């Protein structure tokens, strides 16, 4: 299934989530309820694992038989190797794979390096094309959409170390974050996830399984646009500019979660709208709590590097008094800036009083012309 995002692009609903919390804080509490949700997939996987084991045993006995083509195993073990990952991705035939890792180090081992691991995270979030080319006759050559749902956990120190080189490359913005606060060291009370719980959950799971095609929810689309603008304004007022670049994908994560709830319940509710607002704020709060200092330092280093070369003081100075968004996009391209940041830049300039919206585009304000009179 697919949804249409704020930028007009249609894509899928992969979930990449990382819980960052101290040791012994209860990060493993998701295991029991998620096992209930995945129960049907586990049963199918067990059948196919048995068939694969039988094929391997026959090969060891010298039988010349081809590997069965329909051996989809969707739930991968945390010690999965790179070769096994590529094989399972090829076997899945378009179905989503699921991985649950108790520590990020497992992702590094599977990928072969931190750089490769972060690349997988980025591609998985975007449901982008992934693959490898191999020359061996028995090696897997695959190139397909990377459909992967990943849930992992780690400690704050390990997370900061793992993503130290990926602060500004788009990896962090693509990860849904959570944490566990327990300052009073209260002993957790765990739920009971038995057959009764499975029966209560079954209608929601069935609705999700039956969803397909392009999913539309006008209420969610309208709500997320308002939440994005509100978050950007709030960060500007609070002096948290270092988080501004994280608003867009944090809103995508909140939107995906809301759509999943919408599909599971079969209707749009006030509770889902409230959850969407909370999720966006929570993503930014955890990002700042865990990676805030790291992000600030990376931004300062990037700004220091930019000051070493001539820069345009204000991108609007090159534009006519009235222009359209496409005009600014072309200017962004000419000065080497990312076109994807145009919408955010325009919203910021309107918020700062430098631009006003017109019927067909934007117009510079008198305030802007007075402030930058010597540059226009």
Name these PLM-found stretches:
Residues 1-376:
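Phosphate-handling catalytic cores of nucleic-acid transaction enzymes
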